[in-house]
């Protein structure tokens, strides 16, 4: 297992490359109770030249770590109804991810009500205090959320949740305007969400982002097939 990179070192590794998100949740075609599928996705991504992996769950991350030294952005998806945030939503999930010695922990940093009752700035500060050497990524949906996370000391701001909160911009493709605004504000941006084509990735890379995550367009064959099938119907 490689040593954790510094922010500067990681930014060098990620610059101009693609981080591939390798995830499958229960009920999805590639989900397996016994595991073993996501590390194959990660292996394919590595062979293609990916610069990093985004993965969900302790099990999947451990399996991926066994086959690649690529930096991992780790999350744990767990529902806490009635609250909506479910991506690394409490310190419990942070603790589990921190024990894995991964490069980055990503967490929901939207303004929505949280299970722990904290505002997002307080949560970020608590995590930073507990794990001062752990790089953190804020999954946000609006510019203001990104700014709050940045000012609270987050290392990277990801546009992951744009279009997935009721108050954020609803678009079929990536939220380029949000990515551009965050970059112009001097924030280290990891662009993520609805990036469906190499052309979109190239356009986003030219904005000066710190990294780009692509998931569904690479690792969700059902979603990829649906896009082709829908195109023939139109």
Curated annotation (Swiss-Prot):
<dbReference type="GO" id="GO:0047465">
    <property type="term" value="F:N-acylglucosamine-6-phosphate 2-epimerase activity"/>
</dbReference>
<dbReference type="InterPro" id="IPR007260">
    <property type="entry name" value="NanE"/>
</dbReference>
<comment type="similarity">
    <text>Belongs to the NanE family.</text>
</comment>
<dbReference type="GO" id="GO:0006053">
    <property type="term" value="P:N-acetylmannosamine catabolic process"/>
</dbReference>
<dbReference type="GO" id="GO:0005975">
    <property type="term" value="P:carbohydrate metabolic process"/>
</dbReference>
<comment type="function">
    <text>Converts N-acetylmannosamine-6-phosphate (ManNAc-6-P) to N-acetylglucosamine-6-phosphate (GlcNAc-6-P).</text>
</comment>
<protein>
    <recommendedName>
        <fullName>Putative N-acetylmannosamine-6-phosphate 2-epimerase</fullName>
        <ecNumber>5.1.3.9</ecNumber>
    </recommendedName>
</protein>
<dbReference type="Pfam" id="PF04131">
    <property type="entry name" value="NanE"/>
</dbReference>
<dbReference type="GO" id="GO:0019262">
    <property type="term" value="P:N-acetylneuraminate catabolic process"/>
</dbReference>
<comment type="pathway">
    <text>Amino-sugar metabolism; N-acetylneuraminate degradation; D-fructose 6-phosphate from N-acetylneuraminate: step 3/5.</text>
</comment>
<dbReference type="InterPro" id="IPR013785">
    <property type="entry name" value="Aldolase_TIM"/>
</dbReference>
<keyword id="KW-0413">Isomerase</keyword>
<dbReference type="GO" id="GO:0005829">
    <property type="term" value="C:cytosol"/>
</dbReference>
<keyword id="KW-0119">Carbohydrate metabolism</keyword>
<dbReference type="InterPro" id="IPR011060">
    <property type="entry name" value="RibuloseP-bd_barrel"/>
</dbReference>
